[in-house]
Design a protein with these regions (language model features):
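N-terminal [4Fe-4S]-dependent radical SAM core
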Residues: 50, 57-108
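Glycine-rich beta-alpha loop elements in corrinoid/cobalamin-binding modules
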Residues: 1-69
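Radical SAM [4Fe-4S] cluster-binding motif and immediate context
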Residues: 83-172
């Protein structure tokens, strides 16, 4: 993939998106070349730059596996970025789509990430760990603002397993 994709963010992007943009523009302003900018990006938590890592084909699976840094001192293994406190980044209470009634029939508000069940078959349940929930009062405020701004009269509370959200009863 190194031929096509410069960098991947592994994990949650709310904090990382701004860090990546600032890192890249700062390095560019400093006159660093492309490879040096990629090395700088790779040193941000959760950023994987394929061109900076060596890979090999696993004999058992036939899959290409990252074996470590190719040349530059970059982190290995790459740690997944986790946003510990969802409330630091409030869920948007208005959408970028004008006239949402033409496309959606309700507002969708994220109330939690992750899942408490740990089912072995569920990739999403494993990927989005640990479980994090939004503050119920913030959810209510977001719902009120979203309904006021959108003109909708319905809201869906979304999570991998909404019924398992600890404050779901009072929210309903």
């Amino acid at each position: 993939m190194a031929d096509f994709i410069d960098a991947f963010l592994i994990g949650d992007g709310e904090e990382a998106a701004a860090e990546i943009a600032l890192c890249w523009t700062s390095a560019k302003r400093e006159g660093l070349g492309r490879r040096a900018r990629l090395v700088r990006l790779a040193n941000l938590e959760g950023v994987y730059v394929p061109s900076l890592y060596a890979t090999h084909v696993d004999a058992d699976t036939g899959l290409e596996v990252v074996s470590g840094p190719a040349l530059e001192p970059v982190p290995f293994p790459i740690r997944r970025r986790v946003l510990e406190n969802l409330d630091r980044f409030p869920f948007p209470d208005d959408g970028p789509v004008g006239g949402p009634e033409a496309i959606f029939d309700r507002m969708s508000i994220e109330v939690a990430r992750g899942c408490t069940e740990g089912c072995r078959f569920c990739q999403a349940g494993m990927i989005y760990r640990p479980v994090r929930e939004r503050d119920p009062l913030e959810v209510v405020r977001t719902v009120e603002r979203a309904l006021e701004k959108s003109g909708q009269d319905e809201v869906s509370l979304t999570a991998l397993s909404t019924a398992d959200v600890s404050a779901i009863s009072p929210l309903i």
